[in-house]
């Protein structure tokens, strides 16, 4: 099964962003903080000195746990109290104010929930400044991720999806429907990506986390973890 091209979760699981945000912002869990640092600290050099930074699909807004001093505009399809602007990733109607004015777009584990990721990339380029950045964290459809998704019936994947077609790759009936293979399909072949998106250049594409996430205690849900101190988290990170 884990070598199959597709897997469809039996139901769509919508996390409780209110309770998850409260838990994350108040958390002193070193495992979780270490994970969030891995996801966001690398972005700091790209946003340093930048004026307009917009995160798409912010969800519980956990980026502010790590990068709080910087004015990052949080957007989401749902207007939670901590969200600055309601934005649908498939439309990105930011208005004339932001045309060619955005220094940095941030997408953290939300692109695979977008039914038309190619269209999203296209629309971002309309607002992005020359030499601007799109910073992305996304799942990699590895053997172990597939195993976890099947065991937990957590999310779906499809390596058959035509992500460059500018057409919906799944029914966007809920913002939590997903295809965790999206980033792999978009970015694994640099030449193919460049052909479809000549306005972009992939500067860096690398794997980042595995066991650090599995033992974090959870971002969009809370789960069992073994508490570790910074020393052992750094050791674990070496093997990641």
What is the role of each PLM region?
Residues 135-168:
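Conserved class I S-adenosyl-L-methionine
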Residues 106:
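A conserved beta-strand element that flanks and buttresses the S-adenosyl-L-methionine
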Residues 173-190:
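Acceptor-substrate binding/catalytic loop of class I
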């Amino acid at each position: 099964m884990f070598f199959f091209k597709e897997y469809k979760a039996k139901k769509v699981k919508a996390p409780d962003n209110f309770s998850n945000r409260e838990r994350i912002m108040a958390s002193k869990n070193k495992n979780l903080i270490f994970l969030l640092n891995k996801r966001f600290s690398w972005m700091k050099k790209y946003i340093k000195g930048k004026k307009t930074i917009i995160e798409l699909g912010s969800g519980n807004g956990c980026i502010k746990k790590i990068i709080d001093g910087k004015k990052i505009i949080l957007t989401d399809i749902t207007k939670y109290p901590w969200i600055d602007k309601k934005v649908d990733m498939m439309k990105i109607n930011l208005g004339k104010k932001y045309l060619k004015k955005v220094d940095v777009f941030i997408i953290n584990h939300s692109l695979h929930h977008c039914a038309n990721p190619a269209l999203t990339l296209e629309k971002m380029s309309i607002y992005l400044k020359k030499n601007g950045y799109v910073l992305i964290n996304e799942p990699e459809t590895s053997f172990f991720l597939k195993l976890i998704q099947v065991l937990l019936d957590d999310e779906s994947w499809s390596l058959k999806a035509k992500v460059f077609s500018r057409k919906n790759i799944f029914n966007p009936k809920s913002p939590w429907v997903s295809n965790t293979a999206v980033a792999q399909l978009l970015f694994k072949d640099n030449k193919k990506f460049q052909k479809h998106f000549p306005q972009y250049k992939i500067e860096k594409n690398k794997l980042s986390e595995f066991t650090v996430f599995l033992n974090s205690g959870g971002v969009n849900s809370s789960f069992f973890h073994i508490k570790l101190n910074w020393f052992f988290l750094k050791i674990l990170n070496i093997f990641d």
